[in-house]
Amino acid sequence: MLHQHPQQNRTAQSLDLDGQGLENLDDACLQGNSLLKISLYDNRLRQFPRQILQHADLQVLNISCNQLSELPTEIGLLKQLAMLDCGHNQANQVPAGIRELRELTYLYLSDNAFRDLPVELGRLHKLRYLNATDNQLSEMPAAIMQLGALQELRLYNNQIASLPETFGQLSALRELHLMNNRLVALPEQIAQLSALRVLDVENNAIGQLPTTFGRLVNLTHLNLRTNRLQQLPTSIGQLKALTTLDLRANQLSALPDSLAELTQLQRLDLRWNNFAEMPAVLAPLIAQGCLVHI
């Protein structure tokens, strides 16, 4: 249904047309002063409203939860854009023009049909947050390794089978979410992510952790649930900041003594492994107040 007169929430600098059931956008909605924020979340738009491109000062654009099959090649005209959310659409390609969005800090591409991301994405040197979950990525896009300011990367629910050796270049990364992919290993170079606080690789096929894993000394939350781990490296005892460790549904039958060195650990989940008896190393952890499930 086309709403000829949608219920607008407009100020001098912003336009909010969320949840109006719009299939098209009336030109009159975007006339007037240059807008800084436009939100068209949760409508039925099949085509990107090209009138948006006239708002050269636009800083925030939310066009998520529509039915867009493509993004405009001229998206680069919005050079002041700091946040772009085009998640939950039907697009299969990110236009090369995205390289012009040099002010972009937040980019949401989740739940589309992307099989890769363009090399031009690597020019977004201010990007701090990238979400490309629920797509069809079969490998880590090379452009991501150029995003030196990136602090949070969410790529879960894809088909990624490996991480490149260059992954360690993301020195600012604080959160990495890769659950529900096809990883069989983590590269040694992951130890170079010295700022990493959160690592979630649940539901992959990881058979072992690299010996360098203990260098992730700022890690506080580690989720390794539903993988194929048969043992843990001794270096795991170096993760002194760790507060939560989820090892459910692996193939562990023993634990390294170094685990007792995790004095900040508050929660340890070991259910659905292969322990014949309670590992002795758990006693000091329980004594210090760690909640252990086994």
Regions found by a protein language model. Give the residues of each.
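The feature captures the LRR N-terminal capping module
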Residues: 1-226, 230-246, 253, 257, ...
